[in-house]
Amino acid sequence: MIKRVNWLEIKVTDIKKAINFYRDVLGLKIKNEWPNYAIFDLAGTLVLAIMTGGKKGQKEGAPNVYMAVDNVDEEYEKLKAKGVNFVEPPKKQYWGGYATLFADPDENLFYLTQTKD
């Protein structure tokens, strides 16, 4: 039986640019780094790895990745001020949540979502 998803890899075109985005812009803690690969810890629950070999642009069939935050509107404003490319402003989602959609430098898409704990 599958217990949980614990590792997520995202392909990027420029590892240094991607590390800067995920570490310095999004504030993720880097665990390890190699010339073509880097690993970030997401609150001890999931590992996000970035690796070279990607092509720019959203890939058909790519999974949606949701990152939970305490306040979507606050994070939206902070990240927007840092130049993050938001595809969709914060809004109520059809599934009942509240979220915003942004892209990394390689146009991989991510949601910031606010949930009730």
Question: Where are the language model's segments positioned?
Answer:
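N-terminal beta-strand motif that seeds the catalytic metal site of vicinal oxygen chelate
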Residues: 1-17, 63-65, 116-117
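Conserved catalytic-core motifs of GNAT/GCN5-like acyltransferases
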Residues: 9, 29-34, 91-93
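Amphipathic alpha-helical segments
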Residues: 16-29
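Short amphipathic alpha-helices within nucleic acid-binding modules
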Residues: 21, 73-78
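Conserved short beta-strand elements that form part of the metal-binding/catalytic scaffold
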Residues: 29-62, 109-114
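Short beta-strand micro-motifs in enzyme catalytic cores
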Residues: 38, 63, 96-100
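Vicinal oxygen chelate
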Residues: 76, 80-117
